[in-house]
Amino acid sequence: MVSPQQILDEIRRGTEEVLLEEELKLRLEQGRILRVKAGFDPTAPELHLGHTVLLNKLRQFQEFGHEVLFLIGDFTGMIGDPSGKNVTRQPLTRDKILENARTYEEQIFRVLDPEKTLVVFNSSWMSGMTAADLVRLSSHYTVARMLERDDFYKRYQGKRPIAIHEFLYPLLQGYDSVALKADVELGGTDQKFNLLVGRDLQKAYGQEQQIIITMPILEGLDGVQKMSKSLGNYIGISEPPREIFGKLMSISDDLMWRYLELLSSRPMSEISRWKKEVEQGANPRDIKVKLAKEIVARFHDDSMAEQVHEAFVAQFRRGAMPEDIPEILIVAGREGIAIARLLKESALTASTSESLRLIKQGAVKIDGQRLGNQSLQILPGITHVVQVGKRRFARVSIRLSEDQCRK
């Protein structure tokens, strides 16, 4: 039988902070089923590996017998979380929120156990809140407390606007914990303020305060900025297995250790042993293969993980071109499109500056020919096979815009 201390040690793995750890240990010792909450605003349709840092920790709680409250912030999502933002965020429409929420429900059970997961929508209690309820909720916090939050403080000091609804967001997120009577809440490090608001509100409403666990923000494929679809440095959990495998094989050796800690279910003792082996001369590529196969198997199956590994070996050791090259259509004027912009719009690079750097390094080929001209314009009407590095390919077609066609 696993002891409360052993459970705590496992839960602590990969976390940034556990507030308060002694309280969590006490609740584990009580042996009751904990209600473990994590909220996701469905502001984008696809979950990526960055989201699974939280999902994996939720799954860990489930494996120890606890219940997960997967909160879809369909109400708060229409406000938009201001955390880390230096400008007011544009709210999403209700229809877009619901469309994204449906895809979340389809994707989360690739990680979570559906038998131990309660999916809830915060519109269930927030849509019925009256003006009096909102005023009562707002009375539990002050503007001074809100300005303690770093992003609000910087905007205030810089005389940049802060909308009233942005002050409401942490209160509404915190009230979710009251409505759900959460014992534990998980969130990214950028969510710490909001999670603490939840603790404060639970106390104000006469409830036992939740334990807070913050998780690191996962770096994207570039190893610098956080994983984000908008930055193009992400791995979506619904992507084809070959794409997931190839992207993981492309990460740096340093980033590989970070991904192993936050994404892998391998014991830390095993990962530590691998580190020592690499220090003694073992090839880190072999460990990267293990990581890539594990992640593909998680979102597909073991057989598919073996298949994409074999395909990867064939492609990059024998110089084979992948069979399923993505087809990209770009609309441009008669002057065409600059090659650096084409690479970015085809999602082959994260930015035009990265495009220019890779061209300079000789890492870009068009129709098999290495490109050296950074200012090349690609004209409409022709389809090209574009390659960046060893494993990124796209079949790109440039089409004239309708306005240009009429001229």
From Swiss-Prot:
Short motif 'KMSKS' region, span: 226-230
GO molecular function, one term: RNA binding
Chief localisation class: cytoplasm
Keyword Aminoacyl-tRNA synthetase: yes
Limits of the S4 RNA-binding domain: 337-398
Top EC class, one word: ligase
InterPro entries noted in UniProt: aa-tRNA-synth_I_CS, aa-tRNA-synth_Ic, Rossmann-like_a/b/a_fold, S4_RNA-bd_sf, Tyr-tRNA-ligase, Tyr-tRNA-ligase_bac-type, Tyr-tRNA-ligase_bac_2
Top-level taxon of origin: Bacteria
PANTHER family: TYROSINE--TRNA LIGASE, TYROSYL-TRNA SYNTHETASE
HAMAP family: Tyr_tRNA_synth_type2
Protein name, entry field: Tyrosine--tRNA ligase
Source species of the chain: Nitrosococcus oceani (strain ATCC 19707 / BCRC 17464 / JCM 30415 / NCIMB 11848 / C-107)
